From Swiss-Prot:
Top-tier EC class: oxidoreductase
One GO-annotated biological process of the protein: protoporphyrinogen IX biosynthetic process
Protein name, UniProt field: Oxygen-dependent coproporphyrinogen-III oxidase
Record's signal peptide: none
Gene: hemF
Species of provenance: Escherichia coli (strain SMS-3-5 / SECEC)
Length: 299
């Protein structure tokens, strides 16, 4: 089947609705929607929940942008795209909970298509989800990765290990020599064997995110914590900011294409702190995180 951008867009709009409803049901607060248009073509719906019962900030963004020329960040690793018009659409979300025992989570599913007269369209899907705990619980990590593995299973035995490895490699802070979290799934440039197969996989990832995340939220959201745990959470959020501004391809793509800055930076935590040469005490739960986030097979 030929790529059907309209069908993908409808799925993404529905996915944004569903995820917002599911997060609101857990939190008790509602998302506020901000619709926007992009001068160069396209627009989107940004939805933010702030200072809820469970989530300090949750942002779920839908965007659909198009233009006559592909930006440098996209053509750098796909030189054949130079000179083509493009459409890019996706849902991207980040959830920053109040409670330091509830991990931060991120998910994204997206579709690109680039066309020029007289040539076959170039298209691909990308996306994934990843988890960033501040305090590690093995049962949470196992559940997260088991959910990821199970949704990959119908698409082939090698799919989960391949996209888990890619996720571990992608969400890595080279300047810190550490992982951002415990990973999950990451895929990009997916366009084989055909459109229907790739679209079905992207849908499975989009729908699988809340199955992976919400049981962990329910398990941890009422755990007691104090100033020490909160300070550590804010300190570790700094790594999130560093990754997004220095290494994340999606952030760079959005800023280079004249995307909406407020929506692109919606992934930022509302509060964060840095501390010069911070070293957690040996044997403390905070020190244990360094070991917990190292790459391993969780399932």
């Amino acid at each position: 089947m030929k790529p059907d951008a309209h069908q993908v867009k409808q799925f993404l709009l529905n996915l944004q609705d569903t995820i917002c409803q599911q997060l609101s049901a857990v939190d008790g607060a509602e998302f506020v929607e901000d619709s926007w248009l992009r001068e160069a073509g396209g627009g989107g719906r940004s939805r933010v929940l702030r200072n809820g019962g469970v989530f300090e900030q949750a942002g779920v963004n839908f965007s659909h942008v198009h233009g006559e020329v592909m930006p440098a960040s996209a053509t750098a690793h796909r030189p054949e795209l130079a000179g083509r018009s493009f459409e890019a659409m996706g849902v991207s979300l980040v959830v920053h909970p109040h409670n330091p025992y509830v991990p931060t989570s991120h998910a994204n599913v997206r579709f690109f298509i680039a066309e020029k007269p007289g040539a076959e369209p170039v298209w691909w899907f990308g996306g994934g989800f990843d988890l960033t705990p501040f305090y590690g619980f093995e049962e949470d990590a196992i559940h997260w990765h088991r959910t990821a593995r199970d949704l990959c299973q119908p698409f082939g035995e090698d799919v989960y290990p391949r996209y888990k490895k890619w996720c571990d490699e992608y969400f890595y802070l080279k300047h810190r020599n550490e992982q951002r979290g415990i990973g999950g799934l990451f895929f990009d440039d997916l366009n084989t064997p055909d459109f229907d197969h790739c679209f079905a996989f992207m849908q499975a990832v989009g729908k699988g995110y809340t199955n992976a995340y919400l049981p962990i939220v329910e398990r941890r959201k009422t755990m007691a914590y104090g100033e020490r745990e909160r300070n550590f959470q804010l300190y570790r959020r700094g790594r999130y900011v560093e990754f997004n501004l220095v290494w994340d391809r999606g952030t760079l793509f959005g800023l280079q294409t004249g995307g909406r800055t407020e929506s692109i930076l919606m992934s930022m935590p509302p509060l964060v702190r840095w501390e010069y040469d911070y070293q957690p005490k040996d044997g403390s739960p905070e020190a244990a995180l360094n070991e917990f986030i190292k790459v391993r097979d969780w399932v």
